[in-house]
Amino acid sequence: MTQHDLSVALLAPDFYHYAPSPIAAVTANDDALVVSWPDGRQLSCHRFWLRENTLGHGGIDPATREGIMDPAELSDAMQIAAFDLTDVGDLRVTWVPEGADESAVSTYHSGWLRHIAEGQHLPESWVPAPEVWNASTLSQPPRHQADAVLTDDDVLCDMLNDLLRLGVCLVERAPTEPGFLTALAARIGPVRDSNFGLLWDVKADVNLAGDAKTNTTANTGFRLGPHTDLPTREIPPGFQFLHCLINEADGGESTLTDGAALIEELKATRPDDYEILSTRRWVFFNRGPGIDHRFSAPIIDPLGGEGVPTIRAFYPVRAFPDMPDADVGEAYAALRRFHALADDPRFELTFQLGPGDIMCFDNRRVMHGRKAFSGSGQRHLQGVYIDRDEILSTARAVNRARAARQTP
């Protein structure tokens, strides 16, 4: 290991490896240092940001790689006394002594600074951008083998990238033993709990349908139109995995519709409907003994305002208009057209889940449903929810790890 290899671990305030990207020049600009590379790319580094990201000296804890400086401690006394470049092109800053302390010298890894200059530190980095689809552009979800997802990081990476890009994928040839889904979920991240439990069943069972903790129309044989789960929550689950254990029933085909495609269609052809659906609020309410989850929001909910809005569209729990009386009529009209569009063959995929298939989808973007099925023959699925943060975190980690493996 070279001296520079040793410096990589010491200078980067996180746990990633950064290839050296020697800095060409550094200049002062008011309260910032401007770092420049030979290709002309620049990064402005405010002195407080540099001080917070100093390894040691009260900035970044070398063990946890997390900041330990309380912002209240930032002061005008934190001034840069000198700056230059090391022999290998890293940024070196000497700080004015603070009180009785000796002057601190901070070194910042050139590759770490470069990755910030390129925007690789942003939330959307290291994950694919969403691709909108409809029934003519996506004939079926991409498929991945269960055993490979569990054992091969490259396959896991491909599976998560498909899931984030399209909002849906299928994992096939999984064991049909109850509980296997928890092993697949553990490969990705923690499962999100709900009143249904960490792992829940979907089957036509009058006891499940009426139980205090499992009461839902999903546990009947009724048709379920395109919908998303748990709109009754402030933040609905990000992703849902449904594992088919048995499917001997007549009917019960699964459906998928990309909510992002519906939003594009509405904006292009019915902008008034889009405005109504994204601003008029409804109360979503879980009915059940001992259960009272409720939340008020529009059908197309911008939530954080970035990316694809959250679709809140589960009519069994959409209970009350929460809008001026004068708006209710047009809200119902827009709602009727929206659900008809979601069920339109131009947008909806229809297919049959077989034993061992696991349907994975973005619960806030992709609307799922099923056709009605008869009481003859068994149909048993198990499901889990995983929050978006966990999917994104693991996707970034495996994408960065694959990139590192492919870097000479």
Would you name each region that the model predicts?
Residues 2-13, 126-158, 162-168, 173-174, ...:
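Active-site environment of non-heme Fe oxygenases that use a 2-His-1-carboxylate facial triad
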